[in-house]
């Protein structure tokens, strides 16, 4: 066992050769490297699989022995300063390593087909492998300096991946927005690290916690300064995990390829903030105000993310706001001191959200056969609907992921979310009411996304391809109200390419992508419908290839069974609570005397309540959306609900207010744009003016005046020495007279 721990340092470095070799290959042997590009995908999966096996081995040893292993090397040694590098293997490290590697492998396999059309295929896999290296380095770090180094590497990789299609202006703006927003949090993190080093004199976690606890117990620190440093540390987690108020970058991050969204939202970038708070929880616990602040930020994010997801048309943006809300649940649990519940929900949410994103990618991939490469069309749920019979495997997988996120048993997120909801009653009834209400909102918007995407009719076919007036049938509303107004104001259905109707796609179509031809023939940076290998043009979407469906099906298994890891089956001497063994010793401020057993009566009572709330949200979604999509024969029923009356007008005002709030992102982006972005630009323009006209103007003006004076003097002189002597004595006499009169 000791030998296994000694070689754990290779965990973050195993995926690193792939991006290095790809870079060297493209530099020195570009043609050969591109022609063998699938070999690099295989190597990426292989190396990450080795890391996964190594991580599983470490986790088994963690479960059996509950040991913590740390190894350090002295890097800088001075009289009063020393800096060590090393790695730390504990339950948190092993959990995060398995999470990163399993989700990462599924995303890499999926990406081989999803990105096969793109000429940036090799660059994509290089970024992905470097992303995995950065995140694995972050979770194995043994001190705050290493945390910060890998924290910045994670940010850089995410910046490159969000802006992967950098020639699209919207993608370039999205990665800039993510970069700038995270700079705010990262600067706070750096200041917090320096502040705690000034207090304790150490960057190492083991020394930092011990010294700080001693200082607190002896009342030898300034609590105001300590709280400020803790808030600055937490600011890094707020930005990275898209917590309010630094959440604005997350929806725009959907401009990257869909596999990137799956990895960022499931196991890497946004999970980094949760990991940081979990790692530093022993530090935060002894500062009561910071724990309250963490829980407050968490509950605000929970509710805000859910409300902003209510009216999204873009399927990926809807999932992004869902991620924001679920991360809020994790942050709330950490703020309450419920360490186990937070990590449990991190695990279950990662697999469920990866499943949903890969499922949405499969839907987008199939929709592109109809609308071409245009994210505003292929990701628009208004143009979807009726996909059940065309993509049945994707539909079933997405449905299971939806039910999991809604908290329906026995799927994964039910078990973890229920723990957080139950613990919230012990912490604060107000927070509990908000958290439980948001569970209903989660069920509503997730079910809404499912219905808009898969149920009813394929809405894109309600267009008149001849260019004549559209059909008189009702338009489909994203929000569930009369569609004509909304459709005209917020979106317009697209005019499609002419499609043949004699072709149908099989559910498992065996399409072979010719890599060499793709590399040479792709002259545009983005996917175009003409570059699909299919010789037939489909008038309906078709199911994705096996290489895309395989990771989705594996994630379905995780979604079905990973929740059982955390069920505390500790009855009658049978101890099957694997997660509690894994996390021993665990921190739980709400159940200090708990032995992790469960009162099944209380559990069932709470479960019935939570499932009832989720079921109510699902029912409302079906009530608003299902009748519209079921059949045109229900028009009389629909019309009965749209009769104008006082109650209807009042209801519409409320509904429109909620819609405007959600569709406009809570006006937070507009506020930042008006008061921060515009203000900063005006300040920059003023600084530019002051620098050029005042700072540079003074020395330039002096130089210019000297030049003109010299020119005047030069023109006066005629080259005669007698003239020079005359002017010299004249100036001397003038200055002597001035001195004489002013002196006396």
Swiss-Prot record:
Print the keywords alphabetically. Chloroplast, Membrane, NAD, NADP, Plastid, Plastoquinone, Quinone, Thylakoid, Translocase, Transmembrane, Transmembrane helix, Transport
Sequence intervals crossing the membrane? 9-29, 40-60, 89-109, 125-145, 147-167, 185-205, 219-239, 258-278, 290-312, 327-347, 354-374, 396-416, 425-445, 549-569, 608-628, 724-744
Asked if Transmembrane is a keyword of the record, the answer is yes
Principal subcellular localisation of the protein: plastid
Q: Name one GO cellular component term.
A: chloroplast thylakoid membrane
How does the record say this protein sits in the membrane?
Multi-pass membrane protein
Its Enzyme Commission number?
7.1.1.-
Q: Which GO terms describe its molecular function?
A: NADH dehydrogenase (ubiquinone) activity; quinone binding
Taxonomically, the superkingdom here is Eukaryota
Pfam families noted in UniProt: Proton_antipo_C, Proton_antipo_M, Proton_antipo_N
Report the record's Gene Ontology biological process terms: ATP synthesis coupled electron transport; electron transport coupled proton transport
Its subcellular locations are: Plastid, Chloroplast thylakoid membrane
Report the catalytic activity.
a plastoquinone + NADH + (n+1) H(+)(in) = a plastoquinol + NAD(+) + n H(+)(out); a plastoquinone + NADPH + (n+1) H(+)(in) = a plastoquinol + NADP(+) + n H(+)(out)
Leader sequence segment? none
Please describe what this protein does: NDH shuttles electrons from NAD(P)H:plastoquinone, via FMN and iron-sulfur (Fe-S) centers, to quinones in the photosynthetic chain and possibly in a chloroplast respiratory chain. The immediate electron acceptor for the enzyme in this species is believed to be plastoquinone. Couples the redox reaction to proton translocation, and thus conserves the redox energy in a proton gradient.
Q: Which family does it belong to?
A: Belongs to the complex I subunit 5 family.
How this chain assembles, per its entry, is: NDH is composed of at least 16 different subunits, 5 of which are encoded in the nucleus.
Q: What PANTHER family does the annotation carry?
A: NADH-UBIQUINONE OXIDOREDUCTASE CHAIN 5 (PTHR42829:SF2)
Under what name is this protein listed?
NAD(P)H-quinone oxidoreductase subunit 5, chloroplastic
Q: Which organism is it from?
A: Gerbera jamesonii
């Amino acid at each position: 066992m000791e030998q296994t721990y000694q070689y754990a340092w290779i965990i973050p470095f195993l995926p690193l050769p792939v991006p290095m070799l790809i870079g060297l290959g493209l530099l020195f042997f570009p043609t050969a490297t591109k022609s063998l590009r699938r070999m690099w995908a295989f190597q990426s999966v292989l190396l990450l699989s080795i890391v996964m096996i190594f991580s599983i081995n470490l986790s088994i040893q963690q479960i059996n022995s509950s040991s913590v292993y740390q190894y350090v090397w002295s890097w800088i040694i001075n009289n009063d300063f020393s800096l060590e590098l090393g790695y730390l293997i504990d339950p948190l490290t092993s959990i995060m390593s398995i999470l990163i590697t399993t989700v990462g492998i599924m995303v890499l396999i999926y990406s081989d087909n999803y990105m096969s059309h793109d000429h940036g295929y090799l660059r994509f896999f290089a970024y992905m492998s470097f992303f995995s290296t950065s995140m694995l380095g972050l979770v194995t770090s043994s001190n705050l300096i290493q945390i910060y180094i890998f924290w910045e590497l994670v940010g850089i990789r995410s910046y490159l991946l969000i802006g992967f299609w950098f020639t699209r202006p919207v993608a370039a703006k999205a990665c800039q927005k993510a970069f700038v927003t995270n700079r705010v949090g990262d600067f706070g993190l750096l200041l917090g690290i320096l502040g705690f080093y000034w207090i304790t004199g150490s960057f190492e976690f083991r020394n930092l916690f011990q010294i700080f606890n001693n200082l607190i117990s002896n009342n030898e620190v300034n609590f105001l300064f300590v709280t400020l440093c803790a808030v600055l540390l937490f600011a890094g987690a707020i930005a990275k995990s898209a917590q309010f108020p630094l959440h604005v970058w997350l929806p725009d991050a959907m401009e990257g390829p869909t596999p990137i969204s799956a990895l960022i939202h499931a196991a890497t970038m946004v999970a980094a903030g949760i990991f940081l708070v979990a790692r530093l929880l022993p530090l935060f616990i002894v500062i009561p105000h910071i724990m309250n602040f963490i829980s407050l930020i968490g509950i605000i994010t929970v509710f805000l993310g859910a409300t902003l997801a209510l009216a999204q048309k873009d399927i990926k943006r809807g999932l992004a706001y869902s991620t924001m809300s679920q991360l809020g649940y994790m942050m709330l649990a950490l703020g309450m001191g419920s360490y186990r519940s937070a990590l449990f929900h991190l695990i279950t949410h990662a697999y469920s959200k990866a499943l949903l994103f890969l499922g949405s990618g499969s839907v987008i991939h199939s929709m592109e056969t109809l609308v071409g490469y245009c994210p505003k069309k292929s990701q628009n749920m208004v143009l979807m609907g009726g996909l059940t019979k065309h993509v049945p495997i994707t539909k079933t997988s997405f449905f299971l992921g939806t039910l999991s996120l809604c908290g329906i048993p026995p799927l994964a997120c039910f078990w973890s979310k229920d723990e957080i909801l139950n613990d919230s009653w012990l912490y604060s009834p107000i927070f509990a009411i908000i958290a439980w209400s948001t569970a209903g909102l989660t069920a509503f918007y997730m079910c809404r996304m499912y219905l808009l995407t898969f149920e009813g009719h394929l809405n894109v076919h309600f267009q008149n391809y001849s260019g004549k007036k559209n059909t008189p049938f009702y338009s489909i509303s994203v929000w569930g109200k009369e569609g004509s107004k909304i459709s005209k104001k917020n979106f317009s259905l697209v005019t499609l390419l002419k499609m043949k109707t004699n072709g149908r796609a099989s559910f498992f179509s065996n399409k072979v992508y010719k890599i060499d031809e793709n590399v040479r023939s792709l002259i545009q940076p983005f996917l175009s419908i003409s570059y699909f290998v299919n010789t037939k043009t489909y008038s309906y979407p078709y199911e994705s290839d096996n290489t895309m469906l395989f990771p989705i099906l594996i994630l379905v298994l995780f979604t079905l069974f990973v929740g059982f890891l955390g069920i505390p089956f500790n009855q009658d001497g049978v101890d099957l609570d694997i997660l509690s063994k894994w996390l021993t010793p665990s921190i739980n401020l709400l159940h200090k005397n708990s032995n992790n057993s469960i009162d099944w009566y209380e559990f069932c009572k709470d479960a019935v309540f939570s499932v009832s709330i989720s079921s109510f949200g699902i029912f409302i979604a079906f009530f608003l959306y299902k009748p519209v999509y079921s059949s045109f024969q229900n028009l009389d029923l629909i019309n009965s609900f749209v009769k104008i009356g006082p109650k209807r007008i009042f209801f519409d005002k409320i509904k429109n207010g909620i819609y405007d709030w959600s569709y406009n992102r809570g006006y937070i982006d507009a506020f930042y744009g008006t008061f921060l972005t515009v203000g900063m630009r005006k300040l920059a323009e003023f600084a530019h003016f002051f620098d050029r006209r005042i700072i540079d103007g003074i020395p330039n003006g002096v130089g210019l005046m000297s030049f003109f004076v010299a020119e005047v003097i030069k023109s006066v002189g005629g080259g005669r020495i007698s003239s020079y002597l005359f002017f010299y004595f004249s100036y001397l006499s003038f200055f002597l007279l001035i001195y004489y009169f002013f002196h006396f």
